């Protein structure tokens, strides 16, 4: 598959040929279900778009029945930036409904399969974007990351996935799940392409009140820069043998490149999980209250307004979304607000402070992305099992840090990805370390 860097140098005529070839390949591999629609919009290098990012004139549904028929009346800021830089939206990728999930199984369009092994999950919630890039039916894609939704599917499918610092990329036009956690980012074939796409979409935006009003310099990855990289033995001991082997391999590769490896420790990640899910579900319960059948999307037949609200939301939302709305409403209720929500925010501040202290000693942290390689469909028996599998990714979102997942090893034909975590607004160092590691593993 042609890389993003190569595609950007092609004339218009060749780009149309590339689009036609991508469409043909996608139709031939339709059983993967990476795309929910092969829409096109404008001229330029084709970039696949997750189904929760607004593209003017496209049906954008967040993979939910409740938004079926909704046509986006505007472009998200990231889409405007793509168009301004010679790229064009191409294809809506599948996802977990409203980005709530880790397997891309909760979509109203059916599950997406992992191109590396179709009996296994592609990860989620940006599983369609990861699968499309891995299957060679997308040059690059945009995803969103609330608690690992770019990095985990990237690791499961063997591609590069980058979550920028919170506030670095505009959220204007991204359907909100957890407003203090969500961030749009690139999913690509290699680190260089991720840096190119990141440079295009990053920057302050007056239309997004959570956008950081600080200078955003383009990153130019420097693989020769020597860095202090923190490793976390107490984190890795609970991961599978395949993850531990890949972790050791990455450490050796980084040492060979001249980086200084420093052992660090982080607080027990069980606090990350509790703080994250209370925060994310509370924010989801308020953000999703707007989907009521009145203004847009699905509307159930009903005799009165109250019945319409009840039936629309009961029929329109899937089981996982309803579960999270209920839990979020519970932790925000008057009797439990202090006991759960306020306590979660205090824990979040402690988690952020801990990362800040660690970054006084190191430039980057090397961490697993998931406890194991991509698992088989049906392997996770309960929602709690699924939530616990996010243990390595959610702390990054709670602290608002940048991180990049890249393939490091293989286990029985399945990709093993690890992540490099950086200081807030220091994407340059994240890309420096990632390109150095990628080069060392070639």
Curated annotation (Swiss-Prot):
It catalyses: L-glutamyl-tRNA(Gln) + L-glutamine + ATP + H2O = L-glutaminyl-tRNA(Gln) + L-glutamate + ADP + phosphate + H(+). SUPFAM superfamilies: Amidase signature (AS) enzymes. Keywords: ATP-binding, Ligase, Nucleotide-binding, Protein biosynthesis. One of its GO terms (molecular function) is glutaminyl-tRNA synthase (glutamine-hydrolyzing) activity. GO terms for biological process: translation. It comes from the Bacteria. Allows the formation of correctly charged Gln-tRNA(Gln) through the transamidation of misacylated Glu-tRNA(Gln) in organisms which lack glutaminyl-tRNA synthetase. The reaction takes place in the presence of glutamine and ATP through an activated gamma-phospho-Glu-tRNA(Gln). PANTHER family: GLUTAMYL-TRNA(GLN) AMIDOTRANSFERASE SUBUNIT A, TRANSAMIDASE. Belongs to the amidase family. GatA subfamily. NCBIfam families: gatA. This is Glutamyl-tRNA(Gln) amidotransferase subunit A. It comes from Nitratiruptor sp. (strain SB155-2). The gene is gatA.
């Amino acid at each position: 598959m042609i890389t993003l860097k190569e595609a950007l140098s092609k004339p218009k005529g060749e780009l149309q040929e590339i689009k036609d070839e991508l469409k043909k390949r996608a139709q031939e591999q339709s059983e993967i279900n990476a795309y929910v629609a092969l829409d096109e919009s404008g001229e330029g290098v084709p970039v696949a778009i997750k189904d929760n990012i607004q593209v003017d004139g496209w049906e954008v549904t967040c993979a939910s029945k409740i938004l079926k028929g909704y046509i986006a009346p505007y472009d998200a800021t990231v889409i405007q930036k793509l168009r301004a830089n010679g790229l064009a939206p191409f294809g809506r990728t599948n996802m977990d409904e409203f980005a709530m999930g880790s397997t891309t199984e909760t979509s109203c369009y059916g599950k997406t399969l992992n191109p590396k092994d179709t009996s296994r999950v592609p990860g989620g919630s940006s599983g369609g974007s990861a699968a499309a890039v891995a299957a060679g039916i997308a040059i690059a894609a945009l995803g969103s990351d609330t608690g690992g939704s770019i990095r985990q599917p990237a690791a499961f499918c063997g591609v590069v996935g980058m979550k920028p610092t919170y506030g670095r990329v505009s959220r204007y036009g991204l359907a909100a799940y957890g407003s203090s956690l969500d961030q749009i980012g690139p999913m690509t074939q290699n680190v260089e392409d991720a840096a190119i796409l990141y440079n295009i979409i990053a920057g302050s935006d007056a239309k997004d009140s959570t956008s950081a009003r600080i200078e955003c310099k383009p990153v130019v990855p420097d693989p020769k820069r020597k860095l202090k990289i923190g490793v976390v033995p107490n984190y890795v001991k609970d991961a599978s043998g395949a993850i531990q082997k890949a972790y050791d391999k990455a450490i050796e590769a980084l040492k060979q490149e001249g980086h200084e490896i420093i052992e660090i420790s982080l607080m027990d990640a069980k606090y990350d999980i509790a703080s994250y899910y209370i925060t994310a579900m509370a924010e989801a319960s308020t953000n999703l209250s707007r989907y009521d059948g009145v203004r847009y999307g699905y509307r159930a037949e009903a005799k009165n307004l109250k019945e319409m609200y009840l039936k629309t939301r009961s029929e329109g939302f899937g089981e996982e979304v309803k579960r999270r709305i209920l839990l979020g409403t519970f932790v925000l209720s008057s009797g439990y607000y202090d006991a759960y929500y306020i306590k979660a925010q205090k824990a979040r501040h402690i988690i952020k402070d801990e990362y800040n202290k660690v970054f006084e000693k190191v430039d980057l942290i090397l961490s697993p992305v998931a406890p194991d390689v991509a698992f088989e469909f049906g392997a996770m028996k309960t929602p709690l099992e699924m939530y616990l599998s996010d243990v390595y990714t959610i702390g990054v979102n709670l602290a608002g840090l940048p991180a990049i997942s890249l393939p490091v090893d293989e286990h029985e034909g399945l990709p093993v990805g690890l992540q490099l975590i950086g200081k807030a607004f220091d994407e340059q160092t994240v890309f420096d370390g990632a390109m150095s590691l990628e080069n060392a593993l070639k």
